[in-house]
Curated annotation (Swiss-Prot):
The protein, known as: Large ribosomal subunit protein bL27
Species for this entry: Herminiimonas arsenicoxydans
One Gene Ontology term from the biological process aspect of the record: translation
NCBIfam families linked to this entry: L27
Membrane-traversing stretches: none
Location of region: Disordered: 1-20
One Gene Ontology MF term: structural constituent of ribosome
Length: 85
């Protein structure tokens, strides 16, 4: 006869992989055209001048230049722009 009872089971033990979201290039830093500025879910930050937005809301530079973050508008939205160097 077995001297130990059968081990229990658990319904946990899973976790999703991290998605590596966030700011990749900060204000004042230089970026090349096509470089990713922010990976995000939804439009936490909106695209400004010389910035494009991918279908997953990723913001990327359309030209070479310096990254700048600005808050504007009645809704106090945050925008990211690329100032050509």
């Amino acid at each position: 006869m077995a001297h130990k009872k059968g081990g229990g089971t658990t319904r946990n033990g899973r976790d999703s992989e991290s998605k590596r979201l966030g700011v990749k290039v900060y204000g004042g830093q230089v970026i090349n055209a096509g470089g990713i500025i922010i990976r995000q879910r939804g439009t936490k930050v909106h695209p400004g001048e010389n910035v494009g937005m991918g279908k997953d809301h990723t913001l990327f530079a359309l030209t070479d230049g310096k990254v700048a973050f600005v808050i504007k508008g009645a809704l106090q939205r945050q925008y990211v722009t690329v100032v050509p160097a």
